[in-house]
A protein has these predicted regions:
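Tryptophan-anchored aromatic micro-motifs
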Residues: 1-20, 91-97
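Short, solvent-exposed coil/turn segments at beta-strand boundaries
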Residues: 3-4, 28-35, 53-57, 83-88, ...
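Short hydrophobic/aromatic-rich beta-strand segments that constitute the beta-sheet cores
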Residues: 10-11, 35-38, 59-63, 89-94
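Short, surface-exposed coil-to-beta transition loops
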Residues: 20-24, 44-49, 72-78, 90, ...
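Edge beta-strand at a domain terminus
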Residues: 23-25, 53, 96-114
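N-terminal glycine/threonine-rich, aromatic-flanked beta-hairpin/loop signature
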Residues: 24-52
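Short, solvent-exposed aromatic-acidic interface loops
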Residues: 40-46, 65-68, 94-101
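Mid-chain, well-packed structural core segment of small domains
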Residues: 53-89
Length: 114
């Protein structure tokens, strides 16, 4: 099982409609099956997420952030992990915004050295 506690991720690929970029840094915490985290950078001023870690290590969470335009955004995401040969985790994410146009897309975030 993957323990996400203390891991740091950075955006490496995002759909057109996404606000995450290569400048967005995610800090994850895990306590049992509960996942929480903070993120910021690029077009995101401040964000938080909370969710659960499933038995297959996938993440199911909701997120809220304030973007560079000062708008509050929220959505939900399912992230599937891929473990690299170097032991770093890469998360393949499918997300959907819950506000406004309810845009959806995919992104990839990759673990960096903490």
């Amino acid at each position: 099982l993957i323990n996400y506690d203390g891991r740091i991720f950075i955006g490496v690929h995002v759909s057109e409609d996404g606000e995450v970029s290569g400048e967005t840094v995610f800090h994850y915490k895990q306590d049992g099956i509960i996942l929480s985290g903070t993120y910021a950078g690029g077009g995101i001023i401040s964000g938080v997420l909370v969710g659960t870690v499933k038995k297959d290590d996938t993440l199911h969470f909701r997120y809220h952030h304030v973007n560079a335009g000062g708008k509050l955004e929220s959505g939900e995401c399912v992230s599937s992990p891929q473990l690299g040969e170097d032991g770093r985790v890469r998360l393949h994410e499918e997300w959907q915004m819950m506000d406004g146009q309810k845009s959806k897309g995919s992104s990839v975030v990759e673990e960096i050295e903490s």
